[in-house]
Amino acid sequence: MELTTRTLSAQKHIALVAHDHCKDMLMKWVARHQALLAQHVLYATGTTGNLVSRATGLEVNAMLSGPMGGDQQVGALISEGKIDVLIFFWDPLNAVPHDPDVKALLRLATVWNIPVATNVSTADFIIQSPHFNQPLDILIPDYPRYLAERLK
């Protein structure tokens, strides 16, 4: 597949997602980085977004709850180039009914080459990166070219 460049702006669009057993961990992480996160545009699945907003006062664009389609909504935003970073604290020790949605979300984040954090350590690496508050060019699939090839 051919690639093209997408520029992530200095103000990132960040999706926050957390499974039930990980919500408290994400809430503590957001609270520690609240001042920095306030400079960016936040999205989240429904329950997580409402909890973050209520606890911190941060403006969060909340989707539906994950099991009700929120993971897929976030995935669609990633595919549309509207999400720059995914912070997804998932629980590897407990299965969730919407596991296929979780796998699809992680697959789309990989396809569209956005940074993904799946735990506190990787989230800290991302937020402390010198690229976090700067524009950054990433390589993504060249979808128009892909479609043109498929339609030959």
From Swiss-Prot:
Pfam families assigned to the protein according to its UniProt record, in alphabetical order: MGS (PF02142)
Cross-referenced InterPro entries: Methylgl_synth (IPR004363), Methylglyoxal_synth_AS (IPR018148), MGS-like_dom (IPR011607), MGS-like_dom_sf (IPR036914)
SUPFAM superfamilies in UniProt: Methylglyoxal synthase-like
Source superkingdom: Bacteria
PANTHER family (alphabetical): METHYLGLYOXAL SYNTHASE
Gene Ontology molecular function: methylglyoxal synthase activity
Gene Ontology CC: cytosol
The encoding gene: mgsA
UniProt KW keywords: Lyase
Binding-site list for substrate: 19, 23, 45-48, 65-66, 98
Function, as annotated: Catalyzes the formation of methylglyoxal from dihydroxyacetone phosphate.
Domain MGS-like stretches: 1-152
Organism lineage string: Bacteria, Pseudomonadati, Pseudomonadota, Gammaproteobacteria, Enterobacterales
UniProt name for this protein: Methylglyoxal synthase
Any one GO BP annotation for this protein: methylglyoxal biosynthetic process
Substrates-to-products reaction catalysed: dihydroxyacetone phosphate = methylglyoxal + phosphate
Family: Belongs to the methylglyoxal synthase family.
Residues of the active site: 71 (proton donor/acceptor)
NCBIfam families named in the record: MGSA, PRK05234.1
First-level EC class: lyase
